[in-house]
């Protein structure tokens, strides 16, 4: 059996997953209580509260399994320990768009991505176009709204 692929993530991404895992673990006893309470109402075949609680239990267990799997395969990266002149995972990249408007993105894992928050996945079209590039490189990115062009003006590891 092949080793499972590592999932790169920042320290903040790991903490976000650990916080969500703790929240889900805390929800487990509440769901069990809801199942027991609904079970006490009698006939389970037409007991909507029972079925809703069992469905929620299944959802929570699936989410716990998913998060535990991600954490077990996590390759946690601290961008402050990185350096270099190329865009890599964890880098913060300053760009100029076609209108010379400055934009800044940090290259992160899929679970951490939030484009409006300045964090893009290394697997996103822009993330893939940036990886391995240097300052003053021009890149073209095909997105659903059309092609976009950027100039890399600065690379930081913060």
UniProtKB/Swiss-Prot annotation:
Lineage, highest ranks first: Bacteria, Pseudomonadati, Pseudomonadota, Alphaproteobacteria, Sphingomonadales
Record's protein name: Transcription elongation factor GreA
Domain of life: Bacteria
PANTHER family: TRANSCRIPTION ELONGATION FACTOR GREA
Gene name per UniProt: greA
Sequence similarity: Belongs to the GreA/GreB family.
One GO MF term: RNA polymerase binding
Signal peptide: none
Keyword Transcription regulation tagged: yes
Function: Necessary for efficient RNA polymerase transcription elongation past template-encoded arresting sites. The arresting sites in DNA have the property of trapping a certain fraction of elongating RNA polymerases that pass through, resulting in locked ternary complexes. Cleavage of the nascent transcript by cleavage factors such as GreA or GreB allows the resumption of elongation from the new 3'terminus. GreA releases sequences of 2 to 3 nucleotides.
Family matches, as Gene3D superfamilies: Transcription elongation factor, GreA/GreB, C-terminal domain, Transcription elongation factor, GreA/GreB, N-terminal domain
Keywords attached to this entry: DNA-binding, Transcription, Transcription regulation
GO BP, one annotated term: regulation of DNA-templated transcription elongation
